[in-house]
Amino acid sequence: MAIRRIEGLLHLASEGRYAILVGRFNSFVVEHLLEGAIDTLKRHGVSEDNITVAYAPGAWELPIVAKKLAASDKFDAIIALGAVIRGSTPHFDFVAGECAKGLGVVALESSLPVINGVLTTDSIEQAIERSGTKAGNKGSEAALTAIEMVNLLKAI
C-alpha cells in the first residue's frame, strides 16, 4: 500500500474566492502588501471578480472583521494584511499578539484559512523591506499561502 500524499497546489488558484482584509494603520507599508497580494492572486489565475478587499482601521480590528467575513460563507480564504511597528511603549506587544491570536481563533472556529500577513517589525525600515524591497513582499507570500491552503483543504 502506497503512502497517500495530500498537498495544496498553486495552479488551481482560479477556483477560489479570496477576501483580503487590510488594516489601514501604517498605510505607507500596507498599500504595498495589498498590491503584492492582488498581483499574486491575479498572476495565479484568480479573477478580479473573486477578490474582495475589506478595510479595517488597524491590526487590532482585523480579527473581528475576519470573523464576520468568515461567517458570510462568501470566501474560501481570508488574507489579513497590516503592519505593527515597534515603538517606545509596550503597545506593540499587545496589538501584535492579540491580532495574531485572534486571526488564529477565527481560522480554527470557521475551518477557513485565515492567513496572517500582518508585519510585526522593530523599525519602519524593516517594514518597508518586507513590503516589496529587500526582503520580498509579505503580501505576495500571504496570497501564495492562501492559494495553497484553499487547495489543500479541498483535497482533504
Curated annotation (Swiss-Prot):
InterPro entries associated with the record: LS (IPR034964), LS/RS (IPR002180), LS/RS_sf (IPR036467)
Entry annotation: catalytic residues: H91
Keyword set includes Transferase: yes
Organism this protein belongs to: Acinetobacter baylyi (strain ATCC 33305 / BD413 / ADP1)
Binding-site list for 5-amino-6-(D-ribitylamino)uracil: F25, A59, W60, E61, A83, V84, I85, N116
Protein encoded by which gene: ribH
Protein name: 6,7-dimethyl-8-ribityllumazine synthase
Residues bound to (2S)-2-hydroxy-3-oxobutyl phosphate: S88, T89, R130
Disulfide bonds: none
Taxon lineage: Bacteria, Pseudomonadati, Pseudomonadota, Gammaproteobacteria, Moraxellales
Family that this chain belongs to: Belongs to the DMRL synthase family.
Catalytic reaction equation(s): (2S)-2-hydroxy-3-oxobutyl phosphate + 5-amino-6-(D-ribitylamino)uracil = 6,7-dimethyl-8-(1-D-ribityl)lumazine + phosphate + 2 H2O + H(+)
GO BP field: riboflavin biosynthetic process
Gene Ontology terms, MF aspect: 6,7-dimethyl-8-ribityllumazine synthase activity
Pathway, per record: Cofactor biosynthesis; riboflavin biosynthesis; riboflavin from 2-hydroxy-3-oxobutyl phosphate and 5-amino-6-(D-ribitylamino)uracil: step 1/2
GO CC field: cytosol; riboflavin synthase complex
